[in-house]
Amino acid sequence: MNKGKVDVLLGLQWGDEGKGKVVDVLTPKYDVIARFQGGPNAGHTLEFEGQKYVLRSIPSGIFQGGKVNIIGNGVVLAPDLFMAEAKDLEKSGHDLKERLHISKKAHLIMPTHRVLDAAIEASKGKNKVGTTGKGIGPTYTDKVSRTGLRVGDILENFQEKYEAHKAAHLKQIAALGYTDFDITEVEKAWMEGIEYIKQFHIVDSEHEINKILRSGKDVLCEGAQGPMLDVDFGSYPFVTSSNTICAGACIGLGIGPNRIGNVYGIMKAYCTRVGAGPFPTELFDATGNKIRDLGHEYGAVTGRERRCGWCDLVQLKYSIMINGVTELIMMKSDVLDTFPTIKACVAYKLQDGTQTTDLPYELEGVEPIYKEFKGWNVDMTSFTSEDQFPAEFKAYIDFLEEYLETPIRIVSIGPDREQTIVRK
């Protein structure tokens, strides 16, 4: 029997690594693109035919005509936001109804989930996690508590199910003493979104994806965020509520682990983080501001300033290990084109004075130990081959590959699809 392959594409830092552009570069090789976790709290920014799009729930392969895109069971879906996102794409001439399939087992983000998100965050006072306020955490909480609503529930007796869940949420919100909300308008748009979802293929995605594989077709699994936001392996409690690592593709799509082939890990040539939580290489000076300005480091969904810092190789090696990464893709290399000195963290000094190259249980308070590299001071944005790379940039890449024990196969030198160097 001819069997298709499953490859996984995921970020390796705290999210925002540039997955959208890379998916668009890689998708021509695949028949199906499937999103396996997360929700509208994370956005992939893509440029297609001169127009910029931010995809929050829809897989990035939607711009490749004729390819099936699947929203897997591991995703949490906000019907109103999904509808707005899909209609924006349809206005631009992208027909989604036949090419976008939605898992019956994907959980629904209710309007009251967003209110719960705000209420829980407000109750934490100074210990806020830095949630995006999209209702992601409360939705996954309901999922684990076995009280959630799923896409498959909209097909029969939905209003009754919805009202029961809403009443339970309102009790929780009242218990938290939170009164600053009115869901009337949001609820109206949300219900319109429910009717809109019914126009799509609502499928048993685990069966569909395995039938696709048995037919010999290839699947690219697309993750959101990054492993340092993984609920198990990230900088807990400053994490998201899902498994963002490679194993999440198996859980979030119903694929056996023996199906996984290549695991593409995406990293920036530096590092960023949005929201609260430890960030060992964070820069609080003019260098950090310069990286933010040159890299346009603002959240695709929230617009929040991203915290910027040097590349953290201790953290990256950990992410490569827990994901089984086979190839690296380095984004935004051009952002560092004008820096006289580039740094990379190669070890941590712990609070007891010892040094380690293993990511510790507690990241707060660790001190980065850097290796310095001479900057290349060359505009690489028009390069078409790795043969044009300056010696200083080659030295930086060579060191990263040696330290991380993983090849860097693709180097991005600008936002456009053409500004992508595939290395030999």
What are the residue ranges of the model-derived segments?
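Non-transmembrane, aqueous-exposed alpha-helical and coiled segments at domain scale
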Residues: 1-424
